Amino acid sequence: GMVKNYWAGVKNLQNQLFSIVGSALFAAGLWLVKRYFLSYSWRGMLLTTGVLLNCIDMPFVFLTVFDVVRNQYFYLGETVLVEVPAAANFVVSTFVIVEMAEEGNEGLVYGLLTTTANLGAPVARAIGNQLFGLFRPSLSDSANYIADTPAFRRTVASSFALSYAFSFASLGFLYLLPGQKEEAQRRKREWAHRPAYALAIVL
């Protein structure tokens, strides 16, 4: 966004090169999970990767916002470092979806849950835009980034802090997930099947 373009000064070529490196690390992360972490607790892995993703991001963001380090290579380093935990997060989320599907409707369940999950990002972005629109000075005005006043830096930092707070708060719902495939199968056998539950989750 604005921080990346105006304060970190990220150029398109460097951005694309780091994206390629990030994709390679994402693939490496998928292999690591397959090789070493398949039997680990899903809740534990999602908690660990969720915390790591935020904790890795924070220093790069705040050091750039407060003009401690403003360098495109420094800022892009974060996009590379998060790829391994992001891969683990992705794999575990996929495992949960696969295990929750009943035999014969795996494709339907996978499609429904992945579509619902994919809707989360644009909906969250829309809500975030409305919420961040309340901040003053405006976070969407490029002139504020060019002026780069201490007051505006604090405003930008506050918006990021709010984002991190929501991200950490979402981890509080992890207890709803099964711990591993055995628990997922047990829940499917023993828990009551109610359409209202599915509707509530989708909404």
Can you describe what each PLM-predicted range is?
Residues 88-102, 106-108:
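Intracellular juxtamembrane helix-capping segments at the cytosolic ends
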Residues 43-44, 130-166, 184-201:
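A membrane-interface helix-boundary motif in multi-pass transporters
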Residues 17-18, 49, 78, 94, ...:
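Hydrophobic alpha-helical segments of secondary membrane carriers
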Residues 12-13, 101-116, 193-194:
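Loop-to-transmembrane helix entry/capping segments in MFS-fold secondary transporters
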Residues 15-40, 49-61, 121-124:
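Transmembrane alpha-helices of Major Facilitator/SLC transporters
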Residues 1-25, 46, 73-74, 155:
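Loop-to-transmembrane helix entry
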Residues 58-62, 119-138:
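A gly/Pro-rich, aromatic-decorated transmembrane alpha-helix motif that marks the paired
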Residues 44-92:
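C-terminal transmembrane helical hairpin of 12-TM major facilitator-type secondary transporters
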